[in-house]
């Protein structure tokens, strides 16, 4: 169930402050964040975030297509190694 429109998108307060500072100084520094639950807003477009996946920080460059999604959607937490093969191919 999506968030109510009257509440508006959630962006962590500390992350919002970092975005304002990055926009005012026009720096190209990567913004480090643990806030995977924050929604991508139009003010974030063009900035690079280092989003924590539980083990390390994954760099995420925000584009217009990402607006409305959560930052955590772009840094996967689980590594997929592929499905198990058949036993016949393993015996040979």
From Swiss-Prot:
The keyword rRNA-binding applies. GO terms for cellular component: cytoplasm; small ribosomal subunit. One of its GO terms (molecular function) is structural constituent of ribosome. Coiled coil: none annotated. Protein S19 forms a complex with S13 that binds strongly to the 16S ribosomal RNA. PANTHER family: RIBOSOMAL PROTEIN S19P FAMILY MEMBER, SMALL RIBOSOMAL SUBUNIT PROTEIN US19M. This is Small ribosomal subunit protein uS19. It comes from Desulfosudis oleivorans (strain DSM 6200 / JCM 39069 / Hxd3) (Desulfococcus oleovorans).
């Amino acid at each position: 169930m999506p968030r109510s429109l009257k509440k508006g998108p959630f962006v962590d307060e500390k992350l919002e402050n970092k975005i304002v500072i990055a926009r005012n100084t026009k720096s190209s520094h990567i913004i480090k964040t643990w806030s995977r639950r924050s929604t991508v807003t139009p003010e974030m477009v063009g900035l690079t975030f280092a989003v924590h996946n539980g083990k390390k920080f994954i760099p995420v460059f925000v584009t217009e297509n990402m607006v409305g999604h959560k930052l955590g959607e772009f840094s996967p937490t689980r590594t997929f190694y592929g499905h198990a093969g058949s036993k016949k191919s393993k015996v040979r």
